[in-house]
């Protein structure tokens, strides 16, 4: 049985989402404008009728499809029933939504409907991009008379599987309020528009990797045979083939204003690469993944430096993580550390093949420089000061490297259903007397590998 009935096609649903969302945004901006200029308050009756609400998307399947697809990880139902969520920024997510809805529509004959929801758009999310000018004295009034962000309504219960069942099952991991919250944070932390983020994401904890990414990105933009057309940089720089001295333009200090600056190597079809310098520590790693997950990237990879834990390793060797020892503690409440974080075969293979491709060496020679094993992620930057306890734990786990971000990023990928992987470079060997010293960074960088990860996703 096909239950499409009088429902919408994916294209019709997306158009209606666009129209309803834009209608609410315009109404909210107009009401704010009137309040600023004349003190006029929004009409309470109109608000109750949905003047400022998000649109909602509902997909229903009656369970009658014969032999539904079971192997793919997305675009499928687990049981019959109705699934719903609220939607924000439908234009930004159009390609993603179209892919998902098309699979459900074609393979299951799903019934798709769009209507106004009961959840209002918080006013801070419509200010950006408008011509509205606010000062601090207006903040209290706006918060009193207009919908605002209520943290009690924002959470990851759905993604963490602890939501309370209702008549409708959740259609997405994140509803509109959670998405808007993260989109605002992404712009704040990275210094770039959310529209510029690409689906293939690199995280790093080393500034020099940014330098290499920028250098390589600029060369790609100048190559007429390359699919890359622009480089968006933290701080507002926009680099194209017409930009004079692009690397000099990027070298200003604008990116330093942001906690986790990002650079986006953009393609015309939106299949480019984003690099985020997340700095040091599991807190930053958790934070950026919490927010970036709402964009549903195709993959995120950690490329950074680490401490080598084995005598057989040398500075400049590579570490491909196939397991993680989670001593970061930032996710223990939502993903206990005894839950294993498996490596993803396709990602592991791609990283290994990229290492062979760029090095130009056969597999046996690559294995002399590329160590596969367990990576420890700690929240203690001075773990060396607890040598006895640390050394025992490393031996029990057979760990080969230690850092402060990789396991957190992998755990967040597992938690939010984003493919993940880790390729690190050994920068020091504290357990064997080769500690990190001033000036050693130049030596490490000389044998480093940023260019190895780019063919993996380019």
In which residue ranges do the predicted regions lie?
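Mid-sequence, gly/pro-rich, charge-dense loop/helix-turn segments that line enzyme active sites
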Residues: 229-239, 308-386
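Active-site-adjacent substrate-binding region
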Residues: 346-443
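Conserved small/polar residues in nucleotide/adenosyl-binding loops
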Residues: 450-456
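N-terminal short beta-loop-beta anion/metal-coordinating cradle
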Residues: 9-277
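Non-transmembrane, aqueous-exposed alpha-helical and coiled segments at domain scale
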Residues: 258-260, 290-293
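Alpha-helix C-terminal capping segments
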Residues: 291-296, 310-314, 411-419
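Flexible, glycine/proline-enriched loop segments at strand-loop-helix junctions
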Residues: 199, 274-280, 333-343, 397-400
């Amino acid at each position: 049985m096909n239950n499409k009935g009088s429902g919408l096609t994916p294209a019709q649903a997306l158009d209606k989402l666009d129209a309803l969302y834009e209608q609410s945004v315009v109404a909210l901006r107009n009401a704010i404008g009137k309040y600023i200029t004349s003190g006029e308050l929004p009409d309470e009756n109109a608000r109750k009728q949905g003047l400022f609400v998000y649109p909602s998307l509902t997909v229903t399947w009656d369970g009658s499809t014969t032999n539904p697809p079971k192997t793919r990880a997305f675009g499928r139902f687990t049981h019959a029933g109705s699934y719903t969520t609220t939607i924000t920024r439908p234009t930004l997510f159009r390609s993603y939504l179209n892919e998902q809805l098309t699979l459900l529509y074609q393979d299951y004959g799903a019934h798709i409907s769009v209507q106004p929801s009961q959840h209002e758009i918080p006013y801070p999310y419509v200010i950006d991009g408008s011509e509205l000018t606010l000062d601090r004295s207006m903040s209290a009034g706006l918060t009193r008379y207009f919908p605002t962000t209520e943290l009690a309504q924002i959470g990851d219960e759905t993604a963490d599987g602890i939501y309370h069942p209702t008549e409708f099952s959740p259609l997405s991991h994140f509803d509109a309020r959670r998405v808007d919250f993260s989109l605002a944070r992404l712009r704040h932390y990275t210094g770039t528009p959310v529209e510029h983020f690409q689906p293939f994401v690199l995280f790093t904890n080393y500034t020099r990797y940014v330098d290499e990414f920028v250098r390589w990105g600029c060369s790609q933009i100048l190559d007429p045979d390359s699919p890359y057309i622009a480089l968006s940089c933290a701080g507002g720089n926009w680099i194209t083939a017409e930009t004079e001295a692009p690397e000099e333009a990027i070298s200003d200090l604008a990116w330093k204003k942001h906690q986790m600056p990002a650079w986006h190597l953009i393609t015309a079809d939106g299949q480019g690469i984003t690099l985020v310098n997340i700095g040091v520590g599991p807190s930053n790693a958790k934070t950026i993944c919490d927010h970036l997950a709402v964009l549903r990237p195709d993959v995120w990879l950690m490329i950074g430096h680490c401490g080598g834990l084995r005598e057989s390793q040398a500075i400049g060797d590579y570490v491909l993580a196939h397991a993680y020892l989670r001593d970061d503690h930032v996710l223990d409440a939502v993903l206990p550390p005894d839950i294993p974080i498996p490596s993803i075969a396709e990602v592991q293979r791609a990283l290994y093949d990229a290492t062979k491709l760029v090095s130009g060496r056969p597999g046996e020679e690559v294995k002399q420089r590329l160590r596969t094993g367990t990576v420890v992620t700690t929240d203690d930057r001075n773990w060396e000061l607890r040598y006895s306890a640390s050394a025992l734990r490393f031996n029990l786990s057979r760990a080969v490297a230690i850092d402060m971000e990789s396991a957190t990023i992998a755990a967040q990928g597992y938690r939010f259903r984003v493919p993940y992987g880790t390729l690190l470079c050994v920068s020091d060997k504290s357990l064997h007397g080769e500690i990190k010293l001033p000036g050693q960074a130049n030596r490490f960088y000389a044998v480093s590998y940023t260019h190895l990860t780019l063919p993996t996703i380019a």
